[in-house]
C-alpha cells in the first residue's frame, strides 16, 4: 500500500468507473447519481489531503480507499440506531474500489486491514463505514472484519442519500 499522488488520478478514476459499473450491475444505486459522485474532484481532494491510499500488486495499482481519521460530520447524526461509543474519536473508511481485473481475489480484505492498521497505529480505536442498502459486497466485507451494523446516516439531503452504517470498536 502507498499513498496516492496526483499522477495516480487517472488510474484511480478507471478503477472507480469499473466499480461504479459493478454496483449498477448488482442493482445498487450507490455511485449512480446524476452528480457523478464520487467525482474526479472528490479523489483529487482526497489525494491532496493525504487520505487516498492505493493497493499495489507489484507496480500495478489494483485498488483504492480513503481513510479519514478526523471523523466525519455525516456520522454524527445516526438514525434508526445508535453508536456503541458515540463520544469517542473515530476514523471513517470511504470509497473502497478494486480493479475489475483483480476482482474475486479478496484484495478488498487487504485494503480494509491496512486502513484499520494505519488508524490504529495513529491511536484510533473506533471505525465507521457507510454503504448503500444494496451494496452486499461492502456489507459482507465489513461484517467479516467484525463491524456491527448500528443504524443509518444521511450522506446528503435526500432519501437516496440514506446509508447503512457499521462500527468496529477495538480496545
Specify the residue positions occupied by each region the protein language model found.
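Conserved acetyl-CoA-binding loop-helix of GNAT-fold acetyltransferases
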Residues: 98, 104-117, 140, 144
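Conserved beta-strand-loop-alpha-helix junction that forms the acyl-donor binding cleft
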Residues: 103, 129-139, 157
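Conserved beta-hairpin
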Residues: 51-65
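A short beta-loop-alpha structural element at the N-terminal edge
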Residues: 1-15
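Conserved GNAT-fold acetyl-CoA-binding loop/helix
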Residues: 21-42
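Conserved acyl-donor/pantetheine-binding loop and adjacent beta-alpha core of acyl/acetyltransferases
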Residues: 66-95, 103
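Conserved GNAT acetyl-CoA-binding A-motif
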Residues: 112, 119-131
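Conserved catalytic-core motifs of GNAT/GCN5-like acyltransferases
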Residues: 130-131, 143-163
